[in-house]
Structures are given as structure tokens and as C-alpha cells.
């Protein structure tokens, strides 16, 4: 895990890190989930496997939590399902916050941006509500959902800048691969 950038945004310490989000020392990590919380690939699969040792089992746990927390089998943009981090608790990670970003398929619009903004803001608000002081995000929707990484990072930064809260002290964006992390770093440097 390498921290590439750190800055203060109000009372929040904002970081950009390159590495595996399941290794990041935050109280909550965010999962870029699909609306039915089926953790079949990408960061969702990696987080599910790290938490429960088996992605299928963690999918079942997540779906049960979604039914308990929302009374239905899907979540919308901005809604957050909270599950225990299980095996990751030994690393100090207590919760996984499941959020749903938009499917861009290479396109971008105000509507897609609004959905993505909600996907970033929702977990920040949930962290505030639960008194969680540190939270790490992946680049929601930048993988298989095909949103432009620069737009994703810009939207993430906008959500953090606009977030109003006092409990959350540290927010990180964790990017797995070096090339993408360098793209994100350029956005951080010109935005902060």
C-alpha cells in the first residue's frame, strides 16, 4: 500500500493510495457493488473473498443484510448496505459499505454524474451516522461499468468537498493498479 497524495479538505484528511483496498487501514471500506449485491467480479469479488473466504457466502450475507436494512432485493444509487468485515476485522476494518454506481459503458452525462455522486456521498453519510472516523473507497464505476476514471475521481473529490460531517476524519481513494493510480494522482493534484 502506497500513499501517493495527502491533503486536508476542511477537517478531513484526504488520501490517494495505490494498492489492495482490503489491506487499507480504514474502519470501513466501500464496495462498488451491483444493485443486487452479487459479488461476482472486480473489487466486489476481491472484497467478498477477503471478508468471508468465499465470495458466494459473502453474497448471501450481503443479500440478507440488504433485505433486513431495506426490505427488498436491490439498492439504488446513494443507498448503502452495511455488512461486517469478518476476516478483515483483524486488519482493523470493521464494516463494508456496499454502494452502487452507474453503468456508463464509455459514456458520460449529468445524469450519470449525479448517480455516481450519490454513490460516493451515501457511504460518507452512512459513516457519519455510524460514527466511523475513517473510510476507504475504490474507484466506483471505473471498472467493468465503464465510467471514465478522470470523471470518477473528479466526482469523488466533489462529493468529499461537499460532504458535511464531524465524525469522519479520514477519507481515502484506493486504486489497485499503478497506471490508474497515476491518472487519479493528476486529478488530485489539479483539484486540491
Swiss-Prot record:
Reported effect, residue 20 to A: Strongly reduced affinity for ADP-ribose
Principal EC category: hydrolase
Residues involved in substrate binding: 19-21, 32-34, 39-44, 140-146
Reaction(s) this enzyme catalyzes, per UniProt: 5-O-(ADP-D-ribosyl)-L-glutamyl-[protein] + H2O = L-glutamyl-[protein] + ADP-D-ribose + H(+); 4-O-(ADP-D-ribosyl)-L-aspartyl-[protein] + H2O = L-aspartyl-[protein] + ADP-D-ribose + H(+); alpha-NAD(+) + H2O = ADP-D-ribose + nicotinamide + H(+)
GO biological process, one term: peptidyl-glutamate ADP-deribosylation
Pfam families xrefs: Macro (PF01661)
Keyword Hydrolase: yes
Keywords annotated in UniProt: Hydrolase
Effect of residue 42 to D: Abolishes hydrolase activity
Macro domain: residues covered: 1-192
InterPro entries hit by this protein: Macro_dom (IPR002589), Macro_dom-like (IPR043472)
Superkingdom: Archaea
GO molecular function, one term: ADP-ribosylglutamate hydrolase activity
Annotated EC: 3.2.2.-
Function according to Swiss-Prot or TrEMBL: Removes ADP-ribose from aspartate and glutamate residues in proteins bearing a single ADP-ribose moiety. Inactive towards proteins bearing poly-ADP-ribose. Catalyzes removal of a phosphate group from ADP-ribose 1''-phosphate (Appr1p), but with low efficiency.
Protein name as annotated: ADP-ribose glycohydrolase AF_1521
Protein source organism: Archaeoglobus fulgidus (strain ATCC 49558 / DSM 4304 / JCM 9628 / NBRC 100126 / VC-16)
Organism taxonomic ancestry: Archaea, Methanobacteriati, Methanobacteriota, Archaeoglobi, Archaeoglobales
